[in-house]
Swiss-Prot record:
The keyword Mitochondrion does not apply. This is UPF0060 membrane protein CV_3485. It is a multi-pass membrane protein. It comes from the Bacteria. It comes from Chromobacterium violaceum (strain ATCC 12472 / DSM 30191 / JCM 1249 / CCUG 213 / NBRC 12614 / NCIMB 9131 / NCTC 9757 / MK). Belongs to the UPF0060 family. The chain crosses the membrane at residues 12-32, 37-57, 67-87, 91-111.
Amino acid sequence: MEWLTGLPRVAGLFVLTALAEIVGCYLPWLVLREGRSLWLLAPTTLALALFAWLLTLHPAAAGRTYAAYGGVYVTVAIAWLWLVDGVRPDRWDALGCALALAGMAVIMLAPRS
């Protein structure tokens, strides 16, 4: 668990990775659901490429990184719901985030040889 000393770095990477993925999915949603300009697909490509690159910077094995990242993704997506979509999360959203983050903590903080 030597990576634990870099926990703030890993947490920051997870948040940046989630933001890149959400932007990469939100922009095409705007094009397809809201009739926005097709030009939004250009930054979509950049956001998804950034997302893929950021995943390579995580210190754990790829499968474990993806699994743990899911907990942070859920939390960032709910924050996006509130800050971008203007929908205030309810207690069930908060509970879901807490459970997802607890699962992420089990995966990332478990003692391994």
